[in-house]
């Protein structure tokens, strides 16, 4: 790694520690030329699968779309932003764990529903009504009955 002070090509690692629950490494480095010290952080670059929509269009995974969908369902519901971020993290982990390069948007919708079911039942029904395209009150009732079982 290049020294940020003198631009020398060679630096040495003095100390390494795991941070962020083991998801990244903090390294203390020293330049072998000017002897200045600096800190670097190393994080694994995790690639998300591409999303295959119902019309067969493929697009990159968009975390903002995921967050937006969750936030719409959770609007005016007593769920913390930390809980939402944890749900997003769980969904992303499950998607990466598939090992697939592409994942159907329906799979993502199912994962969202699973997380919403744990977070807030009202938000779950809101999301399900759009995701499953409920046409009438009977379908709402059936979904609520399934939720209560």
UniProtKB/Swiss-Prot annotation:
Name this protein carries in UniProt: Transcriptional repressor NrdR
| Protein role | Negatively regulates transcription of bacterial ribonucleotide reductase nrd genes and operons by binding to NrdR-boxes.
Q: Which family does it belong to?
A: Belongs to the NrdR family.
- What HAMAP family is this protein classified in? NrdR
A GO molecular-function annotation: zinc ion binding
Tell me where in this chain the ATP-cone domain is found. Answer: 49-139
Q: Which NCBIfam families match?
A: transcriptional regulator NrdR
Gene encoding this chain?
Answer: nrdR
Q: Which GO terms describe its biological process?
A: negative regulation of DNA-templated transcription
Q: How is the cofactor bound?
A: Binds 1 zinc ion.
Give the range the annotation lists for the signal sequence.
none
Do you know which PANTHER family this protein is assigned to?
A: TRANSCRIPTIONAL REPRESSOR NRDR
Q: Which cofactor does it need?
A: Zn(2+)
User: Which organism was this protein described from?
Assistant: Erwinia tasmaniensis (strain DSM 17950 / CFBP 7177 / CIP 109463 / NCPPB 4357 / Et1/99)
Zinc finger spans (unnamed) are 3-34
